[in-house]
UniProtKB/Swiss-Prot annotation:
Gene3D superfamilies: 3.30.160.810, Translation factors. Keywords: Ribonucleoprotein, Ribosomal protein, RNA-binding, rRNA-binding. HAMAP family: Ribosomal_uL3_B. Belongs to the universal ribosomal protein uL3 family. PANTHER family: 50S RIBOSOMAL PROTEIN L3, LARGE RIBOSOMAL SUBUNIT PROTEIN UL3C. It comes from Streptococcus thermophilus (strain ATCC BAA-491 / LMD-9). The gene is rplC. One of the primary rRNA binding proteins, it binds directly near the 3'-end of the 23S rRNA, where it nucleates assembly of the 50S subunit. Residues 124-146 are annotated as: Disordered. This is Large ribosomal subunit protein uL3. One of its GO terms (cellular component) is cytosolic large ribosomal subunit. One of its GO terms (biological process) is translation.
Length: 208
């Protein structure tokens, strides 16, 4: 069965094990998620659990949103997401960080930091040309392709807006769970800026 929770990225820090091993960790604050809806094949065509995270003021919500969360007897939520393959939850129940424990392997999804308009070297990792005085080719994108099509094909690696994409990092290890503070410590870095939404789910591809 899949386990999942929504949280907010706080930042990175470091901890030391009893053996003195240094571990860099990302701090995720995951206040209790509220189950807003349980979808079934009969009514919705598929099975999923819809959860809400991070309360917001009622004045910022419209009537349909208020009516939706009222069924769960909770405040309007800033983020609403769905998890599949989760069983045993009812509308109004809470999902807390203690569903995970140290040593669990998870997949973490977030929105990568936006970098703005960038060239092909930074955006796609291409190599630059000679930087000598006589060279005319420094940081340009290179060949646009053969002559015959008389056009540039789609998906050609060119300069453009970089970042701001949905990114998932698989098979990260949970180092520590602190239920009294609603905090999860995950080994390594996770995508996204501070205060951004983070989704933590059970790993799809477990290490063999």
């Amino acid at each position: 069965m899949t386990k999942g929770i929504l949280g907010k990225k706080v930042g990175m820090t470091q901890i030391f094990t009893e053996a003195g091993e240094f571990i860099p960790v990302t701090v995720i604050e995951a206040t209790p998620n509220v189950v807003l809806q349980v979808k079934t094949v009969e009514t919705d065509g598929y099975e999923a659990v819809q959860v809400g995270f991070d309360d917001k003021r009622e004045v910022l919500s419209n009537k349909p949103a208020k009516g939706h969360v009222a069924k769960a007897n909770t405040a309007p939520k800033r983020f609403i997401r769905e998890f599949k393959n989760i069983e045993g939850l009812e509308v109004g129940s809470e999902i807390t960080v203690d569903i995970f424990e140290a040593g669990d392997i998870v997949d973490v999804t977030g929105t990568s930091k936006g970098k703005g308009f960038q060239g092909v070297i930074k955006r796609h990792g291409q190599s630059r040309g000679p930087m000598a005085h006589g060279s005319r080719y420094h940081r340009r994108p290179g060949s646009m392709g053969p002559v015959a099509p008389n056009r540039v094909f789609k998906n050609k690696h060119l300069a453009g807006r970089m970042g701001g994409n949905r990114v998932t990092i698989q098979n990260l290890e949970i180092v520590q769970v602190i239920p009294e503070k609603n905090v999860i410590l995950i080994k390594g870095n996770v995508p996204g800026a501070k205060k951004s939404l983070i989704t933590i789910k059970s790993a799809v591809k477990t290490a063999k």
